[in-house]
């Protein structure tokens, strides 16, 4: 018999090995294998996060760009310039409840959402609390030509200046979703198989056998999902594909084996 973890990988191929090799691992190895499969699913997400240059700020702050009306963008385009990370404003209509352009004498933060284009940074506040400060790097004078170009520049600067924290948050969030889906599918399917024990329709006798078998069935779908993820598929697609492939593989194994060992007798 192959040593672990090679014994596990040898049991995920074909339509009979996942069933026949459901006795080889102990509980510690099963738990480690579960974590390993979840980690494999996370590899594409981590790679995607490390390679992306921007992330939409509105994902974290609702309606953050709503104050940037056409009038505000036009005012910025006509009267604001950014040189070496410093904003210069020559207009007069710089003070408004939701948008402030240039230095402000008012120190108290408003309750409503406010975007303050200060001299060296954009300050976003809401409910009298400062949410974030964004230095002018991707935000350049050319970005004031349209709302789309301005919002893209703001999101890019915000992401680049907070990249470590945002990436960590996204990876942890994705890990939670992948883990939750994995354990719902694996434990749910194992429990359903274990319930059939009394009917003597199948060869399963313990919950450990059922869970081991389900992990064997999840191995190949997880590897395929990993490959798809490396081609840029998003998390929702990966979870959906993994679940569909798992069900199809499980159904095919049932068709081939009826979940019974060759020497099984009721």
From Swiss-Prot:
Origin superkingdom: Bacteria
Function: Has a role in maltotetraose utilization.
Name this polypeptide is given: Maltodextrose utilization protein MalA
């Amino acid at each position: 018999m192959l040593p672990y973890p090679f014994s596990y990988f040898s049991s995920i191929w074909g339509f009979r090995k996942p069933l026949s090799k459901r006795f080889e691992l102990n509980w510690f190895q099963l738990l480690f294998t579960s974590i390993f499969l979840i980690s494999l699913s996370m590899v594409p997400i981590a790679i995607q996060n490390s390679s992306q240059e921007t992330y939409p700020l509105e994902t974290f702050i609702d309606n953050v760009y709503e104050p940037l009306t056409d009038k505000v963008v036009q005012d910025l385009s006509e009267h604001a310039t950014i040189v070496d990370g410093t904003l210069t404003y020559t207009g007069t209509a710089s003070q408004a409840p939701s948008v402030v352009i240039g230095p402000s004498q008012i120190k108290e933060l408003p309750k409503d959402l406010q975007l303050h284009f200060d001299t060296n940074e954009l300050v976003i506040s809401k409910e009298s609390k400062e949410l974030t400060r964004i230095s002018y790097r991707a935000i350049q004078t050319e970005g004031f030509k349209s709302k789309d170009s301005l919002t893209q520049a703001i999101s890019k600067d915000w992401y680049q200046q907070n990249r470590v924290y945002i990436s960590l948050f996204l990876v942890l969030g994705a890990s939670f979703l992948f883990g939750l889906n994995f354990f719902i599918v694996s434990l749910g399917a194992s429990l359903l198989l274990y319930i059939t024990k009394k009917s003597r329709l199948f060869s399963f006798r313990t919950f450990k056998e059922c869970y081991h078998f389900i992990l064997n069935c999840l191995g190949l779908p997880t590897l395929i999902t990993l490959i798809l993820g490396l081609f840029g598929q998003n998390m929702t697609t990966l979870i959906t594909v993994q679940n569909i492939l798992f069900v199809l593989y499980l159904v095919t194994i049932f068709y081939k084996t009826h979940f019974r060992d060759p020497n099984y007798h009721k």
